[in-house]
Amino acid sequence: MVTAHGAVRVKRAYYYCGRCHQSFLPYDDAVGLVDEISPGLRPLVCLAGTLAPFADAAEDVLKRFSGVRLSASTVLRTTEGEGERLRAQLKDGRMVEPAQAEPFWTKPRDDGQPAAYVGLDAFSVPMQGLRAGKAEHRMLYAALLYTPDKEHTRYLVDFELNTLAEQVRAQAGAVGIEQVSQLIAVTDGGNGLEEALQRQLAANLTTVLDWYHAAEHLCAFAKVWLGADEPACVAWQHEAKGVLYERGGDALLAHLRGLDLPPGTSAEVREEYRKLVGYFEHNRHRTDYPTYRANGWDIGSGPTEAGCKIIGERLKGSGMRWVEDGAATVAALRALYVSGGPVWDGFWSQPHRLAA
């Protein structure tokens, strides 16, 4: 057995049942030994595999951490195995309990402030095709549950949007937030994000459209309509964003419908105008920015975008290509790690259950 202090020879009882043809190793079950890596070393191996590419983790990071020498394939196998165990646990609705109490999730908030914000977005993962060839990127969804002061965050990931939204609900309950009315979701206009959260949490979940995402749509239209380098383009962007920020989505829609596009306006501009109006009509219920700001609510999804980058950087290194299961398991451990030391430690202190 390989431990943090080097290789150790372990003698333990081995039993075999001639009737059921099953072997039994009681010592292994008692200490959580699943292969040659000791239970004490496994968290360190997985931490290295979560922080760095497997070869770097084995040849540099792990060796510097502990002096232990393992092959890259061993680090890969151990990291993905524990990541799969974590994924199985989360899909079963069993959230990881932190190693120490976290009362900040349920402490009283200022008037109008939510117990937590919910963020949901996706980022692309480079995939490997047949015979080690390139394949299309796949979108991996990342969800966040974070306190209003941004000091505490839980991260979750999955390739399946509905599965991830279910885990958000379970995670909110696990930290003591029982009422959906205590949550506010801030997302961009990505297809299906708001709907998935409303299906799995509640249809009346309060949702806010990311202000910067909405403003980008106004800027994009202005560039097509007036020309990116024209003073009129900058002036109209400033005016339209001011209407949205100070008066909200209903006022902006009235402003947009009042635009006088001359008869010679190109088909491209008219189509972009149609899409812009449709976008704000679809999202008008979550663009009341004056009220949100008066309540002291967040109107930007910066924490979620940052979370996608923090998790995604482990999957997007130079030359990296992933199979789906490998990406999902490593991303799950990465999300657990960046959720904070108490949660990471809590996972390793659990009784070891093999993934089904």
Predicted features and spans:
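Catalytic center-proximal scaffold of phosphoryl-transfer enzymes
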Residues: 13-356
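N-terminal juxtadomain amphipathic helix
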Residues: 1-13
